[in-house]
Regions:
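Exposed aromatic-hydrophobic patches
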Residues: 298, 346-355
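Noncatalytic modules at the cell exterior or secretory-pathway interfaces
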Residues: 353-373
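Short beta-strand-centered aromatic/proline hotspots
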Residues: 86-95, 693-703
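Terminal (often C-terminal
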Residues: 257-322, 329, 333-334, 376, ...
């Protein structure tokens, strides 16, 4: 006899004596291959007994204060004959009444993997606050350092790949080919050739996102459970096919837009000045000078200047912005003079020229939270004074000192990770990885979410096949065709960048996509095509070749880049892009800032984006294509550019899928009443033996009160 017990919040629930409670369990169902997080759910009813009314706090009575909150699931577990069986959550759906009296509570029991969706909800990747530990300064120096792998903080979770958001790169070694976008390094071009540094954006290691999920979703942070992933696929630095994957931090098309800047610091104006004199200045001795941004007043005792001389005015007029950028000004003098002014932005008179100025050297400091620029003439000192000459004639005039070059505050522009990471739900990110790598998940006895590839999950079974001949109901069984689909299509959702679109137009197939039927045959099946779609962008990258037609220069470069535009050559939004960054050495390339002539960098090492784990298949044959595609990097080299044969389909899906389409595959349905000792230890990767034939478990549905189990089994095949 089997006794089922349900506990909610540690309290045992009364059950109907004749209630049939069954659970369906499956890891991967042949009928729905792309479905992930497949732990069971089961709805059943319990009586409105005094015990249950206490547990559910008479939910039918809405007048009760502090009653049962049915908006959230509650911790629960099942026991069979006082032995723990399954942990999960319950949700109260409704209360059934008879003659206006509570009679039945209708509840649903959820397995722990299903609960993952409830914990994550609709949270976006941008909600993972700890990712901001990887935020970086966004400027010429930092970007060029991170392109070369010179991370100042030795952080290898962030880098900058050669992916441009708008502008095309070419390579033309002709010394006369001075044009923007040509990254070849040769003399005489200055900043006329090269690519702007702000065409590039940072990228983040996918494992860092997994870690951030674990750090956020904890009981200590107020969540219902700790999300902890095993180290079977995630959290394993030796698993290069995942650990080396990065996501391009591209939140919007085109330039980086950020509201985040580093802490505002004072910036001292130290530039030279243009002078303008007025009035009788030429007939008077000087009492002021200007050097390295500092104004010096030097009026000697006995000089025939009037007592109210000099009068000094300071005006600041930054480059117009909308809205205005507030800024602070601090004027300090060697004589102890200090003036601090907080402004709302725009044109401001800081010193009004009313009181005479004392001797001393005065300097200006300005700070703002956002980068602020003062064009030439935007910082202006006016020194005005009167002088009596030897004929006692009063002369008046003065001099203006205007900044000669543009001055900028030193607010540091920050590339904030949570502001720049693509807009994507965390659950969609995880589901996408599960679909891409054919992963499966279950919760172990320690509450760890074990994540493995399906093949490794089945391979982990070390038990001998479980023989159930003596327990099955021989009066009825079915053997069905196991072919659920005509064909299965594997593709990335995002195939909208220029070269990927061109590939589709030429070959009538998606870049990196594949369709599978055994031996490319078309079969009759009860349903149409089945689609496995990974919700990421998949680019075709471009290796640069020297456009110089002179014989000595024709050939490959070591530069490969991504041109993230659509087929109209316009900036493209797309889906979250994942790729392998490979640090390559060789051909020199130039990165510039067309607005700052001194910002020029020559790079001979750089992170190039790739769809393969390595550039040479002798190192690794792994790719993130669903099918074997030609290597963009090896396309024009001698040898076989199709040598990256370890595609996603080949290594993650083929073993399972080719069995599905085999003429020898059968779906066998049998019933059995298993002893508890077998049922307790039964795992979904165990093999079942019937009549000396072995089977994989497709699904099993068990009536927990009677012990009757309905098996769907797939016969094992040897290829």
């Amino acid at each position: 006899m089997r006794i089922l017990q349900l506990y909610i919040g540690g309290q045992r629930v009364d059950l109907f004596k004749d209630e049939s409670v069954s659970l369906t369990q499956t890891i991967q169902n042949v009928k729905d291959i792309a479905k992930v997080f497949t732990e069971f759910t089961q709805t059943f009813s319990v009586p409105a007994s005094s015990v249950n009314n206490k547990i559910f706090k008479h939910y039918y009575n809405s007048n009760i204060q502090g009653g049962f909150d049915a908006r959230t699931k509650k911790a629960a577990y099942l026991e069979l004959n006082n032995t723990p069986f399954k942990e999960g959550k319950i949700k109260l759906n409704r209360v059934g009444l008879k003659n206006n009296v509570a009679h039945t509570y209708h509840i649903t029991f959820f397995g722990n993997v299903v609960d993952l969706k409830d914990v994550l909800g609709d949270d976006l990747l941008s909600s993972l606050a700890t990712l901001n530990e990887y935020s970086q300064v966004y400027d010429f120096t930092n970007v060029t350092n991170y392109i070369q792998g010179y991370a100042p903080n030795t952080n290898d979770n962030v880098l900058v790949p050669l992916i441009t958001h708008t502008d095309r790169m070419i390579y033309n070694g002709d010394s006369n080919a001075h044009e923007y976008g040509n990254v070849a390094v040769h003399g005489g071009g200055g900043n006329n050739n090269g690519i702007n540094w702000y065409q590039f954006k940072y990228a983040l290691r996918l494992q860092a996102i997994i870690t951030a999920i674990e750090e956020k979703y904890t009981i200590a942070n107020g969540y219902a459970t700790d999300i902890v992933f095993s180290n079977d696929f995630f959290n394993d630095a030796t698993n290069q096919e995942f650990d080396d994957l990065f996501m391009w931090l591209h939140r919007k098309k085109g330039d980086v837009e950020s509201t985040s800047f580093g802490e505002a610091t004072w910036t001292t104006y130290e530039g030279a000045a243009t002078t303008q004199t007025f009035g009788d200045y030429g007939g008077m001795p000087t009492l002021s000078s200007f050097q390295n941004g500092q104004l010096t007043i030097s009026k000697s005792v006995g000089d025939d200047f009037t007592t109210n001389s000099p009068k000094v005015t300071l005006t600041l007029n930054p480059v117009l912005t909308s809205p205005l950028v507030p800024y602070d000004v601090r004027v300090t003098g060697s004589n102890g003079y200090v003036l601090l002014e907080n402004t709302i932005g725009g044109l401001q008179t800081i010193i009004n020229g009313v009181e005479p100025f004392e001797n001393g050297t005065y300097s200006i400091e300005i700070r703002s939270d956002v980068l602020l620029q003062f064009a030439a003439g935007g910082i202006k000192w006016i020194v005005e004074y009167e002088f009596r000459d030897e004929d006692f004639i009063t002369l008046s005039g003065g001099i203006r000192y205007l900044n000669q070059a543009t001055f900028s505050t030193s607010a540091v522009r920050e590339f904030n990770i949570t502001e720049q990471i693509p807009k994507m739900k965390i659950i969609d990110f995880l589901s996408g990885l599960f679909k891409l790598f054919n992963l499966t998940a279950y919760v172990d006895n320690l509450g760890v979410l074990v994540v493995r590839t399906l093949d490794s999950y089945y391979a982990a079974n070390t038990k001998a096949p479980i023989v159930i001949d003596e327990y099955i109901d021989v009066t009825k069984s079915d053997v069905e065709i196991a072919l659920p689909f005509k064909e299965i299509n594997f593709a990335y959702k995002g195939l909208g960048t220029l070269l990927a679109k061109q590939y589709e137009q030429i070959f009538n197939s998606g870049w990196g996509s594949t369709s599978y039927t055994l031996n490319n045959q078309t079969y009759d099946a009860p349903t149409e095509d089945y689609k496995v779609i990974a919700p990421f962008e998949h680019m075709q990258f471009e290796r640069l070749y020297d456009l110089d037609t002179s014989a000595s220069n024709i050939g490959n470069t070591t530069i490969q880049y991504g041109f993230f535009v659509d087929d109209n050559f316009e900036s493209y939004y797309g889906d979250p892009l994942i790729f392998y960054p490979i640090l390559n050495n060789g051909t020199a390339m130039k990165i510039i800032d067309t607005e700052v002539a001194s910002d020029v960098a020559t790079l001979t090492r750089y992170f190039i984006p790739s769809n393969t784990l390595a550039l040479q298949c002798g190192t690794s044959e792994t790719s993130i294509h669903f099918q074997n595609e030609i290597s963009e990097y090896l396309a024009r080299e001698t040898g076989n550019p199709n040598c990256f044969i370890d595609s996603i389909f080949e290594t993650k899906y083929k073993t399972y899928i080719q069995d599905v389409f085999s003429n020898r595959r059968r779906l066998v349905k049998v019933s059995a009443i298993l002893p508890l000792k077998i049922y307790y230890d039964l795992e979904l990767n165990n093999l079942i033996e019937i009549n000396q034939e072995t089977y994989k478990i497709n699904s099993l549905t068990t009536d927990l009160t009677t012990g009757k189990t309905e098996f769907e089994l797939l016969n094992t095949l040897i290829w």
